[in-house]
Amino acid sequence: MLDLVKELGVTCVRYPGGNFVSNYNWEDGIGPRENRPVRRDLAWHCTETNEMGIDDFYRWSQKAGTEIMLAVNMGTRGLKAALDELEYVNGAPGTAWADQRVANGIEEPMDIKMWCIGNEMDGPWQVGHMSPEEYASAVDKVAHAMKLAESGLELVACGSSGAYMPTFGTWEKTVLTKAYENLDFVSCHAYYFDRGHKTRAAASMQDFLASSEDMTKFIATVSDAADQAREANNGTKDIA
C-alpha cells in the first residue's frame, strides 16, 4: 500500500473516511491496542475494532509522505469532541489531551492543519442527518471554536452528497452563507465509475469518459453558491 501511494503521488488523505466518521469516537483509537474497545459501526453494520486510530494513521502518513485531513464526527458528537481532538492532535505538552498524546508515544504536536467538519450530512443514510439550516448552524459553531483554539487551520464544510440530491446547490448556499467567516473550503462529493453494461460495453465507457462534463457542471454550481455566500457577507475571501 505504501509503495502504491507513493507511486500515485498522493499528497493528502482524509481520516477517518466516509460515513464511518458520523458514529466514530476518536478516543477509542488511541492508547494500547489491547485496551481499545470494539464498537458497532452504524454506517456499514459491522463491528469496529479500533486497531487503527489517529496515532497509527499519523505514523502511516509519515511513512507515506502525505498530509492528513482529519474528519470530525458531526453525527453523534460535535463541538466538545472536536476541540478535544484538536488539543490531542496539535496541542503543546502541558494540557490533559496533549499530555495523553505524549504518553502514547508522539511527543511533538502533529500539526494537522486541514479538518473536514462532518461527512455528507445531507444524506438520509447518514447518522445524525441534518437539514441545510441545521448543519449550517452546527458547522459555524464548531468552525468558529476551532479557529479560536488554533489559528491557521483550514476548515472544510461538507457539501452535498451528489448532484442528484434534492438540496444540491441550496445546501451549499445555505451552509456557506451562514458559516462564511469560519470556513475555507467546501467538499465536492461526486463518484464516477464504469457501470458495466454487459451488452453496451462501448457505450458504458463513453458514459464514463463523459463524466468530466458532469463534474464541470457540479463544480460550477458549488462555485456559484460560494460566490453568493461571499456577496451576502460582503466578504473578500473566496471559499474554494
Task: Locate predicted features.
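Non-catalytic accessory regions flanking glycosidase/transglycosidase catalytic cores in CAZymes
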Residues: 1-171, 176-185, 212-240
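Short glycine-enriched loops at secondary-structure junctions
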Residues: 19, 189-192
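Active-site His/acidic residue clusters
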Residues: 192-207
